[in-house]
Curated annotation (Swiss-Prot):
Source organism phylogeny: Viruses, Riboviria, Orthornavirae, Pisuviricota, Pisoniviricetes
Protein name, UniProt field: Readthrough protein P3-RTD
Any one GO molecular-function label of the UniProt entry: structural molecule activity
Protein species of origin: Potato leafroll virus (strain Potato/Netherlands/Wageningen/1989) (PLrV)
A single cellular component GO annotation: host cell periplasmic space
Entry keyword set: Capsid protein, Host cell junction, Host periplasm, RNA suppression of termination, Virion
């Protein structure tokens, strides 16, 4: 018996030659195809020796230089709105030392095959302007000549140039430039624009050996190196606190003293807590600007400050101690910002300040109050600068103003004044000692927080504290949310029934910063100038004085006072009729009425009181006699007919005769309460000036009774 061995696939002991052929074809198709890979120039790879075939010796030939391709990326930072310049691609490309002084010196020829020009915007959304750019493929233009291609400063953009556009098809000697890109901005010099990011791809061939300069004499023995000075690192982190007093959300608030603020202090690897001195940079009856002092050791420092301004309040009494009960909003005035200032001999330079703010939604409601009059929720800032301290000194940080008026009060209302704790935001101050040859001064601008808007920020440090004066002379809106229920600032109960009704101690101060009565006079008119009092006024006592800091009359009062001058040309009835005819909404009508009131109020800047009437010669003579020869003593001459009646010898008995009213008394009756108090105070210090002012005073014209009752019906 013989045995048969079958090799291959067997199915039930039966050979399958057709299947074997199919598998053989599949193996051939799955064989790995050879792949050619290009390697970077360097040490040649070791090859395996082939066996078999032609084993003759290898052919020898002249070695050829191998080409390579490299990619370089460089940036042009800190571009302003009006910056200009150019990029010359070749050995003149100083913005990319790795290309100019590095690989370009190792090859005879090069060509740039592509250029990617990107403009990265760092400007705010409200910035304007653009940066124009132009390609010069032959390096023959020295200034920008075409403004066709532009990058918008707020948006940024990118442009790619291929080899045929930048003269990159042919090879260039490594000592000549290939092309040039010129650019120029038309924005403002004070606005930050952004930066350029340039990516180039370079092909190189024919390497060469650069021996460099001849070596000099052998160096002396290297001295023992001195240990490098340690760069100190200091940081302050904390939330300043302030105690305020508030009563109702439609009332003003009272601020306490700032005092010392407790903050975390970090120096190198150690940390603890320290007290930071703080006080008010400026203060008025409507606002107060806080400031904080930070110590600076002797040396040169790079300083970074991050401020996140937010002013929540919390209760100080049980059982809700520490729980938030509202907030104090910020004003939208341009004079409210974070900034720094010099103190104790330090010098600040290279200041960069970016302030942002977040507005409140008009429908946002906190303690039954809305954000419909420009109130702000947050005010943030990032500040960086260099500070040099010849000796141990300090600088100060100034924050946005704390508003005292009811317009910015969003706290819970109580029946009486209660203490509240108010936070003034998170402050982080980092001081990094700046040594020569180090990069500790390099800082990157932090993008604004989501929902924040950039605002105009100062470029110079703040001056010295101004004390009890406004921080800026810019007028600030002071209207209240509910003027009918909110008393004016610094108003006491003096002169009311609670104080006995006495008005003798009332003192009127017209203007917040008025130093003398001359501030109330009008230049260019014949109105008399009241001389200042000979004695300084007594200090104001709380509860016995009343200060008028602002007078903002309404449109109705102005129209009743001078209907001819303050007439806007159309009445409220005309507005209502026009709204109905135009099928407008109630909101449209209200906005038109508000616009009409603004037009009336704007006319106050051009309104001047009427000039006083000419004084008759008789009155002038009477005044001169009264000044030079006052009547003193003496008796009236008795007439011969006195006591003799023309109807017999009867006489009057009982009763008293009514005294005749004098001219001075009649003039006093025309004065308002404020004018009468002014006159009485002046009379105590200078009676002659008070009498002169009284006789030259012209009372305002009487308002028609019909007009007073119906001011919008016109005169009859």
């Amino acid at each position: 018996m013989s045995t048969v061995v079958v090799k291959g696939n067997v199915n039930g002991g039966v050979q399958q030659p057709r299947r074997r052929r199919r598998q053989s074809l599949r193996r051939r198709a799955n064989r790995v195809q050879p792949v050619v890979m290009v390697t970077a120039p360097g040490q040649p790879r070791r090859r395996r020796r082939r066996r078999g075939g032609n084993r003759r010796s290898r052919r020898t030939g002249v070695p050829r230089g191998r080409g390579s391709s490299e990619t370089f990326v460089f940036t042009k930072d800190n571009l302003m709105g009006n910056s200009q310049g150019s990029f010359t691609f070749g050995p003149s490309l100083s913005d990319c030392p790795a290309f100019k002084d590095g690989i370009l010196k190792a090859y005879h020829e090069y060509k740039i095959t592509s250029i990617l020009l990107q403009f990265v915007s760092e400007a705010s959304s409200t910035s304007s302007g653009s940066i124009a750019y132009e390609l010069d493929p032959h390096c023959k233009v020295s200034s920008l000549q075409s403004y066709v291609n532009q990058f918008q400063i707020p948006q940024g953009g990118a442009k790619t140039y291929q080899a045929r556009m930048i003269n990159g098809v042919e090879w260039h000697d490594s000592s000549e430039d290939q092309c040039r890109i010129l650019w120029k901005g038309n924005g403002k010099s004070s606005d930050t624009a952004g930066s350029f990011r340039v990516t180039i791809r370079v092909a190189l061939q024919n390497p060469k050996y650069d021996s460099g300069p001849e070596p000099g004499p052998s160096p002396q023995p290297t001295p023992t190196p001195t240990p490098q000075k340690h760069e100190r690192f200091i940081a302050y982190v904390g939330i300043p606190m302030l105690t305020i007093q508030a009563r109702e959300s439609d009332d003003q608030i009272i601020l306490g003293s700032l005092g010392s603020q407790r903050m975390k202090y970090i120096e190198d690897e150690n940390q603890n807590y320290t007290n930071v001195s703080s006080e008010y940079y400026s203060q008025s009856s409507m606002q107060a600007v806080p400031m904080y002092y930070f110590n600076v050791p002797k040396g040169q420092w790079s300083v970074d400050i991050s401020c996140e301004g937010y002013q929540p309040t919390s209760s100080t009494s049980d059982p809700n101690r520490g729980r938030s009960d509202g907030m104090i909003a910020y004003s939208n005035a341009d004079s409210d910002y974070w900034n720094v200032g010099e103190a104790d001999g330090v010098k600040i330079s290279k200041l960069r300040n970016d302030n942002t703010y977040r507005q409140g939604h008009p429908e946002l409601e906190i303690n039954s109050c809305h954000f419909r009059e420009g109130q702000l929720l947050e005010r943030d800032a990032t500040i960086s600068f260099h500070v040099e301290a010849p000796t141990d000194g300090r600088f100060f940080l100034v924050g946005p103003a704390i508003q005292k008026t009811a317009k910015y009060n969003y706290t819970i209302s109580y029946g009486d004044w209660t203490d509240r704790d108010m936070e003034l935001g998170l402050i982080t101050v980092v001081l990094d000692e700046h040594l020569e040859g180090t990069g500790s001064a390099n800082r990157v601008r932090r993008p604004p927080r989501e929902g924040h808007t950039y605002m105009a920020s100062p470029r110079e440090p703040e001056g010295k504290p101004v004390g009890n004066k406004p921080r800026d002379e810019t007028p600030i809106q002071t209207q209240e949310r509910q003027p009918d229920q909110t008393p004016s600032d610094d108003v006491s109960d003096a002169g009311s029934v609670n104080s006995g009704g006495s008005t003798e101690s009332l003192q009127l101060e017209f203007g917040a910063n008025s130093d003398s009565t001359y501030d109330a006079t009008v230049d260019g008119t014949d109105w008399p100038r009241i001389p200042p009092p000979r004695h300084p006024p007594e200090p104001r006592v709380s509860g016995n004085s009343r200060t008028v800091t602002d007078f903002s009359p309404k449109a109705d009062l102005l129209e009743n006072w001078d209907a001819k001058h303050f007439d806007p040309g159309y009445s409220k009835e005309d507005v209502a009729a026009a709204t109905i005819i135009a099928h407008g909404s109630i909101q449209d009508g209200r906005s038109m009425l508000e616009k009409r009131e603004e037009n009336v109020k704007n006319k106050t800047s051009s309104w001047k009181p009427p000039l006083p009437k000419a004084v008759s010669p008789a009155i002038a003579k009477l005044r001169s006699i009264r000044k030079s020869q006052p009547l003193e003593g003496g008796t009236l001459k008795k007439d011969a007919t006195d006591g003799v009646s023309s109807i017999g010898s009867g006489s009057l008995t009982g009763g008293t005769l009514k005294r005749k009213e004098t001219i001075e008394e009649r003039l006093l009756q025309t004065l308002t309460t404020e004018q009468r108090l002014w006159y009485e105070n002046l009379k105590k210090t200078n009676p002659l000036a008070a009498t002169q002012w009284l006789f030259e005073y012209q009372p305002p014209p009487q308002v028609d009774r019909n007009l007073a009752e119906k001011p919008f019906q016109g005169r009859k």
